[in-house]
Amino acid sequence: MNATPRIASLFDSLLEQKGSDLHMSVGYPPLGRIRGELVPLREAPLSVPEMESLLFELINPEQKRQITEDLDLDFAYGYGTKARFRANYFYKMTGLGAVFRTIPSKVLSLEDLKTPEVVRKLADRRSGLVLVTGPTGSGKSTTLAGMINYINHTRPAHVLTIEDPVEFVHESQKAQVTHREVGPHASSFATAIRSAGREDPNVILIGELRTNETMKLALQLASFGVLVFATVHTNSAPATIDRIINAFPAEEQGQVRGMLAESLAGIVAQQLLKTADGKGRVAALEILVGGSAIASMIREGKVFQIASKMQAGQGQGMQTLDMHLERLVKDNVVTPEAALEKAQDKENLAKVISRLKPDWEVPEALKSI
């Protein structure tokens, strides 16, 4: 469906300011997330009739039926040649609302994203489970798209993506890339993942591991010789491992530990921070690389030891989030305050920053940490 001038003006305003999200709520003006901050895109608040008119003009009759019956709708919207958006419609106390997340029209390469070499090595794997994790809006999809883009341009492989909705569209290069969307192409993630095993894939991207059923299916595929990429909403590598194991009943957790220990290739946990110059955002990455030592810790239930292993595993490309935050502060990419806001051990990082920058004073709000 074509955007009318009313909503097109909001999309254009967001894109001109390099915003990441458009928030629309009844009783408030449309808000854009610009460099991490929500700012009004116009002064006038949205009324109920205006909201429904603006949002319904973008969807087809089947989608209107879905939002009316399910009270929730996810879909991808192509705004001409300018951009794609991942849209979520939902109902709340004040009525219909929506969030549109910008999907860059160009798939950024790993070089564009300035990811460390170890991320490319994870994409070079021929099998195993690679998880990209972080909170909503931390750039997980962008990092995964960069890894798929790398595979697409470097080797002949069948790459299958299963998403809800499809975000980045990859045109086949050296690889054959097949996109499947939950809803139009499959009834559920689980159904699509089961079917994937019969579609001769070398690489599978699963938009999100939401249930223990999809987690187990992903682990099985990874152990069968497929390279599986997926996202999880967790803030660190150890928390990701715990999240997967704890998603299962106690009687199944031993088996899941074994499967995860065998198949885990790596975890990239990321956070987005505003840059020190205020002109953009940068990703801080925690990186875990699977291996015999990590596998033993997972099997033996010693996940609490993994952070220490990452600190000692720099030769393998491993790092904790705080290690990367320290480097970003040292290189003046981010401010000490921005780094401390995301740090896992705020007290320790504050001490490290004080040594790096003797003239820096810990803000009063942080002295009680």
What are these regions (language model features)?
Residues M1-I369:
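Short, flexible helix-loop junctions that flank or precede catalytic/ligand sites
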